[in-house]
Amino acid sequence: MRTSRLTDLDLWKQLKAHAEKMALPENHLKHLTMAPERLAEFSIQALDMVYDFSRQRVDRQAIDLLMELAWERKVTQRFQAMTTGAVVNTTENRAALHTACRDFSKAKRVVNKIDVTAEMARVRKEIREFSEAVHAGQITGATGKPFAHVVVVGIGGSYLGTEFVARALAAYADKGICLHFLANVDIHNFGEIAEAIDPETTLWVIVSKSFTTAETMANANQAAAFMKEQGLDPARHFVSVTSKGSPGDQTGQDAPFPVLRSFHMFDFIGGRYSVTSAVGGVPLSLYLGYDRFETFLKGAHQMDVHAATAPPTTNMPLTAALLGIWNNNFLEYPAQAIIPYASPLARLAPHVQQLYMESNGKSVTAEGKPLGVRSGVIIFGEPGTNAQHSFFQLAHQGAPFPIDFIGVIKPQYDAFQALSRGVTNHQELWANLISQPRALAEGKESEDGHRSFSGNRPSSTILLEDLSPASVGKLLAFYEARTVYEAFVWGINPFDQYGVELGKKLASEIRSQMAAKNRDAGHTFENVDSISRFYLEKLMGKGNDE
């Protein structure tokens, strides 16, 4: 899709001028938030959620201009086209149909002669049957003992989303299954897991589309060797989530990597968008039970429908995306924090960090032309109130950055009602959640400079009724849709990630040097650049001239 250069748009120039106006003293948030109708005008309620942006540095004109920008860039049409199977991943000539994973309708979608609707139903059925058989003790390890540990072996999008959801819904977990994540190729990660599991009752879930990802295969091979050392047949303890026809998509002892069962993932679902596919479906169904996983999917689908069909002014992820553009390109904040006041959401920020930064960390348009403006910002976060004792000093009195606060009305554990200072723990949490956005927005003047707060620091608050599987699904899909909408405004492709390729290529060259040294102790690193050679010699020795 050809689009005009952003900075040439009259709307873009109007937004630039309006951002200067919003910097005037009379538009400080301490004044804007005093308006009686501020919350009603600058918040959206839908799907048992509230998206409150009343403490963003916007007025009605700013929102109207941003909505015009969304219309000009045809982002809603592009989002709808994405959900029906259009080729929106233009650099790889692929659809991006992560939303199909959680769509239980019979609407037919065909991509590259694949009936996507039928394939999604097939994969969900296979996941249900497998997870229920494991829970019933019908599928066991080599010694006949039921599985009690599940280890997800994957990296990046192959585990981060699953880890977020598993942590968020741990209160709903099957208490007979412990879930572990082996992502880092660092042997310390493997060693810690090896000490925590019972090999006889461990099921390894290898997640790799190609079954060639260096870190994942190094860990998978390490796990297979470990199981053999315990006298166990890896083929009875390994399942794969991979693409059709990959080396991991085969069972039996003659397979390149024998597995008990394989589940399919598809090239029209990117890793960072894949938690609702078999990538998350297999481990989460084992950990939570399939029915809870399906409820999670249906929550995500509700948000997908909202994101695709709600009018722009009442569309939560679209509004969040436009505010992201505003804060980044017009107010020039280089980062955003995600602060959930709910410890089960501790892994949300790392997931969104990868989702957003890998999707939108681009410098060229989908057509390969210079973008001309900054795209993605740095995403980081920590649960509240922990974050208040970590980086909130900087948030209040140092370099400002926008924050998404997330609050939950009903905690997963509501039986604990002891009072301290007259309130429960959950109420104490909320006292802080209510106060922090206000303090950031309003600030406080003081003759003592050390006690002066400039305020005017923007934030949004996302309110969830509970942390049920459906609510977590909605939250996941909210951030996915927000990420995609921002990309569509910029005209970039949020579904490729060529930025990771150069480092991988150089790592392959270094790996070859290491392998040569392992084969021949006399091998020298004379063909390697001097800086890399220093580290290789520190790690493996110099060779002939030692």
Curated annotation (Swiss-Prot):
Pathway assigned in UniProt: Carbohydrate biosynthesis; gluconeogenesis; Carbohydrate degradation; glycolysis; D-glyceraldehyde 3-phosphate and glycerone phosphate from D-glucose: step 2/4
Catalytic activity: alpha-D-glucose 6-phosphate = beta-D-fructose 6-phosphate
InterPro entries: G6P_Isomerase, G6P_Isomerase_C, Phosphoglucose_isomerase_CS, SIS_dom_sf, SIS_PGI_1, SIS_PGI_2
Pfam family, one: PGI
Broad EC category: isomerase
Keywords: Cytoplasm, Gluconeogenesis, Glycolysis, Isomerase
Biological process according to GO: gluconeogenesis; glucose 6-phosphate metabolic process; glycolytic process
GO cellular-component term (any): cytosol
Protein name, as recorded: Glucose-6-phosphate isomerase
Organism, scientific name: Desulfosudis oleivorans (strain DSM 6200 / JCM 39069 / Hxd3)
Gene for this chain: pgi
